[in-house]
Amino acid sequence: MIQILTGTALLLAVLALFTLFSYKAPHGMKAMGALANAACASFLVEAFHASLFGTQMGITFLQGVGDASGSLGGVAAGILVPLALGVSPAYAVLVGLTVSGYGILPGFIAGYLVSFVVKFLEKKVPAGLDLIVIILVAAPITRGIAMVMDPVVKSTLLQIGTVLIQAQETSPIIMGLILGGLITVVATAPLSSMALTSIIGLTGVPMGIGALAVFGSAFMNYVFFEKMKLGTKKDSIAVAIEPLTQADLISANPIPVYVTNFIGGGLSGIIVAMMGITVSTPGLATQIAGFAVSVAENGMRGFIAAVACAVVSIIAGYIGYFIFKNYKITTADEIRGTQEEVAA
């Protein structure tokens, strides 16, 4: 139990760190938005093509498409974050390519930090020499940062994963509550539930919990975003399909979103654990692919569990609204300057 509490506290600390970064770090919100775009460009493609069309339907070509995209999350983050911070496209690609082979979070951290180095060099080095200097200085620094951060990120994810494994050894209700709650929270955070469940090799009932809890969260987040008026209808649909598309908005409202997701995910997890739904493929903690594989491997029992998870998740969305309806929120307009852009 102590280990479970320790791991849970670690997860909360990581989530708090991302929120602090969004608010206090220079261009934090822009960087988080770029991270969300990188996750969509890599993990979402991987979820559909590799996990669904490749693994489940046996389409080898699409398996390759998904695997290729999923393996380049770090490169995507390393390119998109500098672009968001105002680095010229050529230098942004240069930075991103140097983190090839590393995950999305090491790529994000390296891309963010080196963006300031590149902008400084662009300003101070005479035109014509800046390309050579940036190649000689920024490229090795970028890879060095990614190399240092990679074991830190992996050890953090593995520690969180240990919580999920430890919970499996307790009662089904506790296992479902903790796994469902934590994986659903991770699904809304920049950690990526797909990456987490892949790294720790989650299979069986724990993976079934992750798959259907995240599936249910699509309905819950849509209801919650709509009722709280966090963004437009488009934002609500986007967060239902892939929460990472709204990473900046979620990081700006961490307590309402994470608490609501833990409630819905925990309820879904209990249902899945009690029904014994299993998934044999790790990394399927994603809305559409998780649902499809759960039903494919468990038949009508999996479908019934999915419907039940959707129902309790919708209820959780309303519960979250009633809890936080008077809570001061930060809207998409405030974060992204939508109203100002329209007025201009």
What do these predicted regions represent?
Residues 2-342:
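Pore-lining transmembrane helices
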